[in-house]
Structures are given as C-alpha cells and as structure tokens.
C-alpha cells in the first residue's frame, strides 16, 4: 500500500512525457561521449553534478533503482523488501551472488557502511541530509557516534532501516547515488582518492583515467543481470568545446555530445535532413536559477534580493536558448507535483527594482560577482543577467569558470555572492518536490561542500518540510503536495533565489545509437549507460 501510493503520487507527471521502447537491444560496440568539463570525482558519496551523475549510476549499485527511462522504482541490489504499516521500518533482502568488481560478494554490512560513510561529516559529501529520517542521524552528523543506529544487519543478506518518522521519499532516497554500495577495503586502500579509483558492483568498470583528457569504462562481465550493459565500452573525452563535439559527431567520430547542441546551431541542425535522428529533445524536472548568498552583504537584505528578482529579464534568456526554455517564477518546475500554477512570483520591473534598492540604502547600486560555468551558452546568459543588473545600478563582474570550480565556490561559505546555476542545477534526483528543497534550499544543504549556494536557512520551513515528508498516508497525497507547494511559494517571499528558466533537455547522438529517446534524457540518470546500445 505504502509503496503503491509513493509511485503513483510522484511519477504520473513524468511518465506522461516518456515514450515506450520499441527497438530490440543488440550487444557489443564501443562508444565515445564528450563533455567540455573534466570529471571532478566518481565517489558516490561526494559526486553531485549532472555529468558525473550518469557515470556513478552505472559504476555502482543501490538497493533500489528505476526502470530505464522512467521514474518507476524497482528493487536492484534488493531482491525484495517490506515496509511496516506505520512506515517506520523497511526490511530488504539482498540478491545473492552480486559481486564488487574486486571479486568480493556484496553483503548487508556493505550497505550499512556505505550509507554511514555518505552521512559522516568527515566525508564532506553533499547528500547526508537525504537520510535525516534514519534513527541515529543526529548522533552521526553531530560527531557523537561513528555508526547509524537505525541500520541493522542481522545477517549478510538482510538490511533493516528504522526511521524516527515516516518519510514518503525513502525508497527514492535508497535509489540515489548517495545510497550506492561500496566496499570498505577499497575505500581504505584508495587513501582518500576513491573518487579516482572507484570499485562498485554496477554495469561499468573504470579501466583508465587520464586527467583532463579521457575516462575509459568497460562493461562489467560479472554484473548480476546477464547481457547488461549492451555496450562493450564507453570512452568519455573531456575538454571538448560543444561546437567541436557537434562537428565531430557529424563526422562519425563521436556518438553522444553530452553538452548538447549549442543554441546558435540548434535550428540549423533541427531543420537538417539528419536532425530528427540526431536530436533528443524532451522536458525535464529542471529549474535554472541565480543564487543570492544570504550570508554576505548586501544580499543579507531581503529587499535587495527581491530587487534582483525584479531586475532580470527572463524572456530574453529564453530567446538566447532559441525557445528551449520557459520563464520560471518559483523553485519547482511545472511538471513537479506541488507546482502552484496560480503563483506569479516577481515580475520583470526595473522601476520597482530600483525603488527597492533605494529603500535598502543602495540607490546608487553596488558591486558584486556573478559566477557561471564557462560552457556555452552559460557565459552568454550570465552576461545577459549582468546587463539587466547594470540597468538597476548593480555592477556585477562575471566570473566564468570550469564547472567544478563554480561548485566548489558555491559550497564555500562567503565565497560566491551570486551564481548562475545553468549547466549545473537543478535537475531532480527523483520526481518529488522535497528534492527541490533539502539539498538546495534547506538548512542541511547550507554546509561546506553543500549545494545550498544561497546559504539560506529557515528553520520554520525546515520543520514544515519534515511535516510534509512525514505524510505517508495514501489519503494525504493531495495534502502533502499542497504543503510542499506552499513551502516553495513562501520561500519566494525571502527571495534567496531568482528562479530564471525551466529548460528542456537536449542531447545530440549519432545515427548508430539505438534505443528510445527517454534513455538519453533519463529522468533519474540523464544518460542511461545501462540501457543505450549500438544498432
């Protein structure tokens, strides 16, 4: 009952846009994927960007996963599971014979260790807050314990979770990368470099990594589902400008241009004879936003933050993207349960923005820094925002850096006054409104290495978020969604963000790549390396 409600209440909007697979898979083949930015880490407890997310998904396994191209939850490392009527106890039975790539069998203690590692403050991972409902969470994060009392392993094949409160998202949490299972001996042997020397039980194995050039992955011959993955190897080439990658794809040298099609080339490619076969274009649970660091002046003043919300011309930014986005007015994207269709947010109003700045004592404006990634079109969008801010007296220096450097700046207290999130965030980890709160707007994300780059912490909203996620009764689906919707519209009164756009996902693939479009814009993986194949 609990499981059925969870799936039905969170996936309907997403599943409606996903096509059904029609092609028969074939085995074999080596593919080349390109990105401009290098990969920062493949450690599942730390990696949290849209580029490494797909690779981590395929290197490791978790208790739960999703049917390819959908948001349908299914057991993975777990062979079966049960949930108590009160939603406080989850018991999982593990598949037998699943092995790490070092040859050792996966056992229950590995699950416990891996989640404790993801939560432990010493790891400095951004995903600890997802496990906040597990008993003992506060003791582990507070440093009074090294273990999690809410995870029990009575034998090698059984894992039991005891929660302090019901959590309507908990099965989804066990499917995200932070719940990936790793072997302790491999983590210890890597001596702090597990992100470059990953050992997992997923479909792929990292064979070689030349920093700044390429990563080479091979299929795991011992993966527990025979015949998966379908491809033999994946070579990820980094340092590739999107335009160069597109030209190489057209020549047959590249199979997937991971950064998509540069907006300036999109209509040309779309209208070309090969466009229909090359372009994968679909909606996604995405919001692109500007973070305003609430802990540094002048963004500690709500009037300044509200003024910035009114200063940005979002329609112009959608034109930069050739219409591949729509203006956003709240953190939640339109397809997410809880989205408030009646909410209008802050309109584009230069005069009101100037008046608010004057009220805050900044009639002559101020100087600040706007961080952005350096992959097209993000610098151009940042420059458009810079021009809009200049029109109200705010002089913003655009600092366009590699993605990893921007993420590091955002997760360092006081480092980044403003960040344009384009190319980094936020695409839902799973299709539930809570995922647009905890990591990026909740108090738990406002930590060193976290993704709450506005460093916004509203304890009253945190309490309401916990109350919303504790609504695990099937009869309270609508109530829970409404509660989340009100949380997000109330956040906008504090204006820690400027929600700018809801963008479509566009990927370019070669004609030899097979499978339905939804596995190239997978709602929980981005690119699903487990399911793609060569024709």
Regions from the PLM with identified roles:
Residues 188, 192-195, 221-268, 395:
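Ligand-site clamp/hinge motif
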Residues 31, 168, 210, 311-341, ...:
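Detector for C-terminal structural segments
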Residues 68, 145-149, 163-229, 233, ...:
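Gly/Pro-rich hinge or "lid" segments in bacterial periplasmic/extracellular proteins
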Residues 37-54, 77-78, 104, 126-127, ...:
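A structural "hinge/loop" feature
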């Amino acid at each position: 009952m609990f499981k059925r409600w969870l799936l039905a209440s969170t996936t309907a909007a997403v599943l409606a846009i996903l096509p059904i697979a029609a092609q028969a898979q074939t085995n074999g083949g080596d593919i080349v994927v390109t990105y401009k930015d290098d990969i920062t880490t493949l450690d599942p407890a730390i990696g949290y960007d849209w580029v490494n997310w797909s690779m981590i998904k395929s290197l490791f396994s978790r208790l739960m996963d999703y049917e390819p191209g959908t948001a349908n939850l299914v057991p993975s490392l777990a062979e079966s599971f049960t949930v108590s009527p009160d939603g406080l106890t989850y018991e999982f039975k593990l598949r037998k014979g699943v092995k790490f790539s070092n040859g050792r069998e996966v056992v229950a203690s590995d699950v416990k260790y891996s989640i404790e590692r993801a939560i432990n403050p010493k790891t400095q991972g951004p995903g600890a807050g997802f496990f906040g409902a597990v008993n003992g969470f506060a003791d582990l994060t507070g440093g009074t314990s090294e273990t999690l009392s809410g995870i029990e392993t009575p034998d090698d094949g059984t894992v039991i979770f005891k929660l302090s409160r019901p959590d309507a998202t908990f099965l989804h949490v066990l499917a995200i990368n932070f719940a990936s299972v790793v072997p302790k001996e491999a983590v210890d042997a890597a001596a702090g470099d597990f992100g470059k020397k990953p050992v997992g039980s997923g479909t792929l194995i990292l064979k070689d990594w030349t920093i700044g050039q390429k990563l080479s992955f091979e299929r795991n011959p011992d993966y527990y589902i025979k015949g998966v993955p379908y491809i033999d190897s994946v070579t990820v080439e980094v340092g590739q400008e999107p335009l160069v990658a597109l030209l190489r794809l057209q020549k047959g040298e590249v199979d997937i241009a991971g950064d998509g099609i540069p907006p300036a080339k999109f209509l040309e490619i779309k209208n070309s004879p090969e466009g229909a076969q090359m372009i994968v274009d679909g909606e996604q649970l995405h919001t692109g936003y500007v973070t305003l660091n609430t802990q540094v002046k002048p963004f500690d003043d709500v009037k300044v933050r509200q003024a910035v919300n009114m200063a940005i011309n979002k329609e112009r930014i959608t034109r930069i993207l050739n219409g591949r986005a729509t203006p956003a007015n709240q953190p939640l994207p339109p397809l997410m349960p809880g989205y408030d269709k009646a909410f209008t947010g802050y309109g584009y109003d230069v005069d009101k923005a100037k008046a608010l700045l004057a009220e805050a004592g900044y009639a002559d404006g101020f100087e600040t820094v706007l961080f952005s990634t350096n992959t097209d079109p993000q610098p151009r969008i940042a420059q458009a925002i810079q021009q809009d801010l200049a029109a109200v007296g705010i002089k913003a220096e655009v600092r366009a850096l590699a993605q990893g450097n921007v993420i590091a700046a955002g997760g360092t207290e006081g480092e980044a006054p403003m960040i344009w999130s384009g190319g980094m965030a936020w695409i839902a980890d799973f299709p539930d409104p809570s995922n647009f709160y905890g990591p990026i707007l909740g108090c738990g994300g406002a930590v060193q290495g976290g993704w709450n780059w506005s460093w916004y912490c509203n304890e009253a909203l945190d309490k309401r978020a916990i109350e919303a996620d504790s609504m695990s009764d099937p009869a309270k689906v609508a109530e829970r969604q409404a509660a989340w919707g009100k949380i997000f519209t109330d956040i906008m009164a504090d204006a820690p963000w400027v929600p700018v756009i809801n963008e479509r996902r566009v990927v370019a693939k070669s004609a030899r790549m097979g499978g339905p479009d939804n596995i190239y814009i997978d709602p929980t993986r981005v690119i699903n390396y487990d399911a793609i194949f060569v024709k």
